[in-house]
């Protein structure tokens, strides 16, 4: 075989010329100690607060405590594989998550990774999870209704797009049921081809719940056809505390994508008590000083910076909105505990759910007297304002009278009338789960209640009366419902027609 020296030297020269000196410089630190989901790391002198770091085995973590001689890192995953002396490298990126419409219909973990087995997520953008809330100038006052489909809420405690309304109550009082019904009620708005200004996308963040509970929730959404316009972010009870802490921020960032692009979204945090507990655990393990109930001093800021991101933006910013429905679980109806008082003071109103009402069969178990919406009737349609104004006053009087009526047996006629009306209105506000009503249907039902058409009926017949009236209006008299829906008002002409229909129906019903 003939070896040509010139040819070999030419090849060698070519190889040397194209030899890439690609040395990657990464800043690394060393694990000093690890345990309870917290790693102390020496080095990483230039790491940023909130920066994502990577351990040798690929597990991610987030730098939270920047001290003089070490960095406290919370670990997003199991800490079993991480050993003392291993290296940790910076990623130079603050914790972020994929955003966009590609997430709709998916179930993701607290870092935005899919956990539903439907393949990778199609997302073009990534956003930081912890960003500053919009200032005062880009905002606009809340004025559009965000219908939940529940009579007791839409009539008495109306929620507007861009509002923050707290759902608070003991365990097993139906807090998640209200959230679920609210998501299901958006189905008619999210039909194919509907204008973006009408649609309302839903983000549900499950924090510290059982996996079976989250799976059940997703199953209901799927069965009812609501998953296609929803995103579920799940940090279950078996996930480490840092995941439960970051999940609400991840969900909020996904919701903000819609808000900032002129669309509308609602986000449900279920529940923030568990996020506060996870944050307390992390803070204590990082040796931050404890405060009231052993929560850290900045637990108020934790929730306020999250909930301030829900906003209604003005026309220059695209008119989008993000509505927040945080859930808080109380212990034995104690709303004066630390976390409940904090969140009550941050939000624009609260829906109180009570165990006693729940067991009396009043479901949704809303205590109408203690619940408020600080946005109020500016978030209601004109039609609803006209009929719901009366019901508030009548129920307030009923509650006052009912307390006194327990003492005396001989009541005058007007008091008796008031008690009768109140008990029927209370019955009218009951509603089974998964059966949200459209705004126009709620208006006609409440109209019948406040105008005395239920007074002659026994309380047990109220539900049957309501169902019959609605099926009559959906069938023969659908033009009345359409008129209320299209004008969003109850004009004198429509009210006259409605009165005639209800009167005729009431006569036949007896």
Curated annotation (Swiss-Prot):
One of its GO terms (cellular component) is plasma membrane. ATP binds at residues 169-176. The keyword Membrane applies. It is found in: Cell inner membrane. Its EC number is 7.1.2.2. It catalyses: ATP + H2O + 4 H(+)(in) = ADP + phosphate + 5 H(+)(out). It is a peripheral membrane protein. The record marks 371 as: Required for activity. The keyword Membrane applies. Disulfide bonds: none annotated. One of its GO terms (molecular function) is ATP binding. Keywords: ATP synthesis, ATP-binding, Cell inner membrane, Cell membrane, CF(1), Hydrogen ion transport, Ion transport, Membrane, Nucleotide-binding, Translocase, Transport. F-type ATPases have 2 components, CF(1) - the catalytic core - and CF(0) - the membrane proton channel. CF(1) has five subunits: alpha(3), beta(3), gamma(1), delta(1), epsilon(1). CF(0) has four main subunits: a(1), b(1), b'(1) and c(9-12). Produces ATP from ADP in the presence of a proton gradient across the membrane. The alpha chain is a regulatory subunit. Belongs to the ATPase alpha/beta chains family. This is ATP synthase subunit alpha. It comes from Rhodopseudomonas palustris (strain BisA53). The gene is atpA.
């Amino acid at each position: 075989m003939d070896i040509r020296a010139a040819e070999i030297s030419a090849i060698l020269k070519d190889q040397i010329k194209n030899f890439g000196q690609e040395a990657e410089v990464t800043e690394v630190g060393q694990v000093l100690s690890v345990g309870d989901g917290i790693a102390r790391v020496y080095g990483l002198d230039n790491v940023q607060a909130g920066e994502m770091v990577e351990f040798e085995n690929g597990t991610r973590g987030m730098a939270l405590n920047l001290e003089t001689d070490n960095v406290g890192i919370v670990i997003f995953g199991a800490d079993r594989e991480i050993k003392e002396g291993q290296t940790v490298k910076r990623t130079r990126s603050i914790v972020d998550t994929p955003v966009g419409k590609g997430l709709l219909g998916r179930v993701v973990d607290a870092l935005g990774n899919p956990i539903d087995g439907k393949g990778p997520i199609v997302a073009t953008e990534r956003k930081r999870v912890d960003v500053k809330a919009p200032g005062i100038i880009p905002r606009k006052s809340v004025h559009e209704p965000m219908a939940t489909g529940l009579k007791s809420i839409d009539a008495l405690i109306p929620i507007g797009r861009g509002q923050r309304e707290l759902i608070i109550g003991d365990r097993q009082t139906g807090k998640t049921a209200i959230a679920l019904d609210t998501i299901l009620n958006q189905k008619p708005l999210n039909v194919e081809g509907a204008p973006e200004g009408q649609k309302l996308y839903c983000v549900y963040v499950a924090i510290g719940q059982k996996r079976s509970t989250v799976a059940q929730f997703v199953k209901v959404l799927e069965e009812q056809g609501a998953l296609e316009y929803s995103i579920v972010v799940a940090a279950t009870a078996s996930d480490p505390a840092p995941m439960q802490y970051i999940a609400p921020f991840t969900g909020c960032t996904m919701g903000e994508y819609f808000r900032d692009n002129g669309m509308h979204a609602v986000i449900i945090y279920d529940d923030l008590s568990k996020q506060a507990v996870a944050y307390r655990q992390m803070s204590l393990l990082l040796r931050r000083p404890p405060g009231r109930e052993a929560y850290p001093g900045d637990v108020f800021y934790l929730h306020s910076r999250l909930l301030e991101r829900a906003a209604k933006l003005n026309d220059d910013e695209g008119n989008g909105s993000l509505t927040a429905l945080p859930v808080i679980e109380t212990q034995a109806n104690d709303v004066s505990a630390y976390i409940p008082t904090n969140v009550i003071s941050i939000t624009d109103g609260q829906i109180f759910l009570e165990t006693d009402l729940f067991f009396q069969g009043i479901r949704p178990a809303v205590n109408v007297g203690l619940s408020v919406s600080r946005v109020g009737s500016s978030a209601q349609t004109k039609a609803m304002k006209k009929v719901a104004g009366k019901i508030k006053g009548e129920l307030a009087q009923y509650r006052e009278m009912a307390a006194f009526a327990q003492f005396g047996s001989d009541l005058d006629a007007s008091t008796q009338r008031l008690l009768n009306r109140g008990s029927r209105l209370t019955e009218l506000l009951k509603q089974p789960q998964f059966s949200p009503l459209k705004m126009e249907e709620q208006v006609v039902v409440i109209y019948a209640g406040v105008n005395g058409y239920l007074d002659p009926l026994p309380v047990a017949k109220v539900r049957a009366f309501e169902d019959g009236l609605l099926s009559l209006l959906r069938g023969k008299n659908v033009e009345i419902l359409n008129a209320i829906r299209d004008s969003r008002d109850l004009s004198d002409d429509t009210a006259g027609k409605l009165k005639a229909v209800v009167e005729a129906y009431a006569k036949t019903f007896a």
